[in-house]
Amino acid sequence: MNTVLRYPGSKWRIADQLVSNIPEHKSYLEPYFGSGAVLFNKPPSPIETINDLDDDVINLFQCIRDHSQQLAAMIAAIPYSRKVYDSQFSIVSKDPVDKACAFLIKCWQGYGFKTSGIKTGWKRDKTGRERAYNLSNWYHLPEWIEGIAERLRNIQIEHKPALDLIREFDSPDSFFYLDPPYLLNTRSAKQYQHEMTEEDHIQLLETIVHCSAQIMISGYDTPLYNDYLHTWDTLRIPNQTTSGVVREEIVWMNYTHQLSLYDFGIL
């Protein structure tokens, strides 16, 4: 599947590698959903639940599930235009589909768009590329929206604090993929509408070390995580940031991961 949401911290480039390390489970929970890179690249589970505190994220995926044709038609009729992009920051609509459309315009047409509400410049192609990739992606977006709509119809969509769901869904038959906003001292700026303080991260870590569910959590290398998760398996995966810089991500797992072709650099 193709991504329908350009989102800070997205895992689309490394999704296959993450999915290859997911163990067998009956219930799948992703409490910090974002663009949903892992869920949209893995096989369906018997029970699947996604969650995000960001109203725009939840509204978007609910609209894709329930009104995909209407949303796709709206996107298809909108040009890739600086004027269109700029206008989204002064227009506020209560209609869910209009809100989803505006969110997509901001995410796809803004350079390094941040969901924190900060307006960035309009993104365009000039020279040095064989074609206008940003424009091409925008005009393929309607078909990508239609492509994930059916997948979303079998998924429970939550909208509450992640820790509440982690506690509620905790069981040996569950698997959690956690991709929280990374510690602010490991990155250059705030990117999300709902950031996490160091105390928030400590509460998360103190919760998951006592869970019976199988858990995978992503982050940057940091003493706080290494101290709490020192008994967990780890993977180190290079990934490209929103700004184009390659940084090494750490994936901690409270289970023994199976070696794959990725571990040997073959894929």
Cite the ranges covered by each PLM segment.
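SAM cofactor-binding core of SAM-dependent methyltransferases
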Residues: S20-S90
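Long, positively charged, glycine-interspersed low-complexity recognition regions
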Residues: H194-L267
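SAM-dependent nucleic-acid methyltransferase catalytic core
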Residues: M1-I14, N21, R65-Y177, P181-A189, ...
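Structural beta-sheet core signal
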Residues: I50, L178, I215-I217
